[in-house]
Regions:
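Short, well-ordered alpha-helices that flank and scaffold nucleotide-derived cofactor binding pockets
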Residues: 19, 23, 195, 251
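N-terminal glycine-rich phosphate/pyrophosphate-binding loop and immediately adjacent elements
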Residues: 1-121, 262-263, 267
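Conserved redox-cofactor binding core of oxidoreductases
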Residues: 106-217, 223
Length: 267
């Protein structure tokens, strides 16, 4: 199988990438996702993460290393599995980063990543700009209002918008919900794009290695239905497998600390 762009991981970012890149009909896009689509109603109900976190179909069920200050306990590290990734099982808070973080990225040599440059893309993703990601206001209540007032009394300023570039202070968050239902990125971004002839989604495909020619990534090997497959990329391979599995996949492909790879017998 061959495409112009191969995206590994259909999670919070991967679904957005697949939807946006396939807007160009000249690009052939393949999205490789280890999880399977699910009709589990708890994935749509906001309180449902109590049922889905820890479920082997929806959560990779990672654990931390033993914690020496907690009697060597291993703590759960939930990571979503399936189209939508961790946005399937997270707390649904919609919170953009702080202006200073983006401005620092630009100052380090990444033009176009400053806050004023990226903010239009945040705005574009929401319905006010014909975007697909619904964000809802939390209903106000007396107890939360009292908490905000108490924070102000303690010197913590109230804020009406955590997404305006300064997310310090006390106030009401926004939620990625619509009409009381969770809006994960699989539903918001990927589902409307799946009918495009230039987008193919490989569900149940576990990526095992990035293929290289010299220093250039040219494809991905994966296992689907117990069979090994290779998806070749004419232009780019994009790793979007999350904070744990993107570096893991690089290490399985021979990219990482030489000492670690040597101990594991990885070339």
């Amino acid at each position: 199988m061959q495409a112009d762009i191969v995206i590994v991981g259909g999670g919070s970012a991967g679904c957005v990438l697949a939807a946006r890149l396939s807007e160009d009909p000249a690009l052939q896009v393949v999205l490789v996702e280890a999880g399977q689509p699910s009709r589990n109603p708890w994935l749509r109900i906001p309180i449902g993460y109590f049922k889905t976190v820890g479920h082997p179909r929806h959560d990779w069920r990672f654990e931390t290393d033993p914690e020496p200050d907690m009697a060597q306990r291993r703590l759960p590290w939930p990571r979503g599995r399936g189209p939508g990734g961790s946005s399937l099982i997270n707390g649904m808070l919609y919170l953009r980063g702080h202006r200073a973080d983006y401005d620092q990225w630009a100052a380090l040599g990444n033009p176009g990543w400053d806050w004023d440059s990226v903010r239009p893309y945040f705005d574009r993703s929401q319905p006010a700009a014909d975007g697909p990601l619904w964000v809802s206001e939390l209903p106000r209540d007396a107890l939360s209002d009292a908490f905000i007032a108490a924070a102000a009394h303690a010197g913590i300023a109230p804020t009406a918008d955590f997404n305006g570039g300064d997310n310090s202070g006390a106030g009401y968050f926004r939620m990625t919900t619509r009409h009381g239902r969770r809006m994960d990125t699989g539903r918001a971004f990927l589902a409307p794009a799946r009918g495009r002839p230039n987008l193919r989604v490989l569900s149940g495909a576990q990526a095992t290695r990035v293929c290289f020619e010299g220093r250039r990534a040219v494809g991905v090997e994966c296992v689907r239905d117990g069979k090994a497959e290779r998806v070749s990329a004419r232009h780019e391979v994009i790793l979007s497998a999350g904070a744990i599995q993107s570096p893991q996949l690089l290490q399985l492909s021979g990219v990482g600390p030489a000492g670690l790879l040597g101990r594991l017998g990885l070339p």
